[in-house]
Amino acid sequence: MKERWRFLIEGSVQGVGFRNSCRRRALDLGLCGWVRNLKDGVVEIQAEGDELALNELRLWCERGPSAATVKRVLLSKIPVTGNDWFDVRT
């Protein structure tokens, strides 16, 4: 069953390639959705797919790309929207 999760990634996560790395990982996992930087320094991700793939993305987010320092990952389940792509938003 398809689910949609919202991730808020806190730490040193902007300007380190987090969004593009996240997009690649999400596509590898067969997920749809988007990722963007927020003005407060947080990275927001909304991803949609099966629970196992979403959990794998969560595990990846806890580490992030090598240049990132992840302090905390906040997660919430949100309504499925039916996206069929994964985009980097500005």
UniProtKB/Swiss-Prot annotation:
Gene3D superfamilies: 3.30.70.100. InterPro entries: Acylphosphatase, Acylphosphatase-like_dom, Acylphosphatase-like_dom_sf, Acylphosphatase_CS. It catalyses: an acyl phosphate + H2O = a carboxylate + phosphate + H(+). Coiled coil: none annotated. The keyword Hydrolase applies. It holds the Pfam family Acylphosphatase. It comes from the Bacteria. Residues 4-90 form the Acylphosphatase-like domain. One of its GO terms (molecular function) is acylphosphatase activity. The keyword Hydrolase applies. The active site is at R19, N37. Keywords: Hydrolase. Its EC number is 3.6.1.7. PANTHER family: ACYLPHOSPHATASE. Belongs to the acylphosphatase family. This is Acylphosphatase. It comes from Synechococcus sp. (strain CC9311). The gene is acyP.
